[in-house]
Amino acid sequence: SVGFKAGVKDYKLTYYTPDYETKDTDILAAFRVTPQPGVPPEEAGAAVAAESSTGTWTTVWTDGLTSLDRYKGRCYHIEPVAGEESQFIAYVAYPLDLFEEGSVTNMFTSIVGNVFGFKALRALRLEDLRIPNAYVKTFQGPPHGIQVERDKLNKYGRPLLGCTIKPKLGLSAKNYGRAVYECLRGGLDFTKDDENVNSQPFMRWRDRFLFCAEALYKAQAETGEIKGHYLNATAGTCEEMIKRAVFARELGVPIVMHDYLTGGFTANTTLAHYCRDNGLLLHIHRAMHAVIDRQKNHGMHFRVLAKALRLSGGDHIHSGTVVGKLEGEREITLGFVDLLRDDFVEKDRSRGIYFTQDWVSLPGVLPVASGGIHVWHMPALTEIFGDDSVLQFGGGTLGHPWGNAPGAVANRVALEACVQARNEGRDLASEGNQIIREASKWSPELAAACEVWKE
């Protein structure tokens, strides 16, 4: 007789283990599972655990050469989703040995790899991940983190202000640098390359880097404040990306930028290591995130992408506005904003946080609020995001009727007014509009901005 029982397997026999005690070293995942009609929850949950770890669809001879018990993923808990009939949350525990140290790429290849195309499931969404301390410690994380960034920039006690240079495509390098200078001169801390500005025929990267560096040094000299421009180093190859980062370092600028999802985690981690070694801050843009996180029942929630970025490395990351033109529910957004900034985050399902996460002193990331925001939003943004954030007004700066510099002045005056009001104990949520109106009496630039964008 054959030494093992051949044939197609019932996953739940091996991979559904409701009495399993999770280990401190396990990576834990919460999946929202929508099985095909007729597939029981236990089988679907077990299938997810199997397909994203050691399983294959049939019993194989080589299973006998290893210890499945040591290496298999386990579905250890299943709970129904309130208000959804055929949907539930499956909790899966993965032994740490399944993952390469310091590789977000490998972690995702396993956990969100082939399993998302699995036939027995109608849809699958990864809602949250618990990264164990032992695995966190294998990552460098953000190049510098929030405190070091404040020290480098000498800016304390308030959110930082940025602006994306528009029109995003079509300006020459010289005119682009001119727009950068105007914004920084007016009072912003940062300006930003748009995520799709890489190195195109109308503006090659080296020319842009040069003119932007000139603009920020001129603005720095005139304002006495440290200025930055996020130079987008994203490129078609890792070598080209590093070449751009090297040139930024040679120019002596404080910060570069990367599109971490389109560029990929391998490239991102490479750049993050370079940035720490060379004293550059790293701004991260999340272009492509909505492809992955927009669907409610398939894909990955952004909080998982945010956690992955903190491991891979970045000092700023775009994370929605709660107000403005891009969607984002307040509690949920604040949940992953805290995951980015804090050292320790408690499990709290009302904020979408399925697991308690301890970052064991990995530096924090500044959340960036960007997209359709303007001066009237300033009180709400200051209240929601607090000091440790970057508020980015693209059109909200460049759309000012008098030009970029006055637009920058309006934003800076509005921000300083909100911070001062908050420090005096006023309630930004209820008195916000009044605070902006009072400030606009002393600032014609702000008054003009208040006219253009109605409260």
Curated annotation (Swiss-Prot):
It is found in: Plastid, Chloroplast. This is Ribulose bisphosphate carboxylase large chain. Coiled coil: none annotated. GO terms for biological process: photorespiration; reductive pentose-phosphate cycle. Gene3D superfamilies: Ribulose bisphosphate carboxylase, large subunit, C-terminal domain, RuBisCO large subunit, N-terminal domain. Pfam families: RuBisCO_large (PF00016), RuBisCO_large_N (PF02788). The active site is at K166, H285. Its EC number is 4.1.1.39. It comes from the Eukaryota. RuBisCO catalyzes two reactions: the carboxylation of D-ribulose 1,5-bisphosphate, the primary event in carbon dioxide fixation, as well as the oxidative fragmentation of the pentose substrate in the photorespiration process. Both reactions occur simultaneously and in competition at the same active site. Heterohexadecamer of 8 large chains and 8 small chains; disulfide-linked. The disulfide link is formed within the large subunit homodimers. The disulfide bond which can form in the large chain dimeric partners within the hexadecamer appears to be associated with oxidative stress and protein turnover. The modification N6,N6,N6-trimethyllysine is found at K5. Substrate binds at N114, T164, K168, R286, H318, S370. Binds 1 Mg(2+) ion per subunit. The record marks K325 as: Transition state stabilizer.
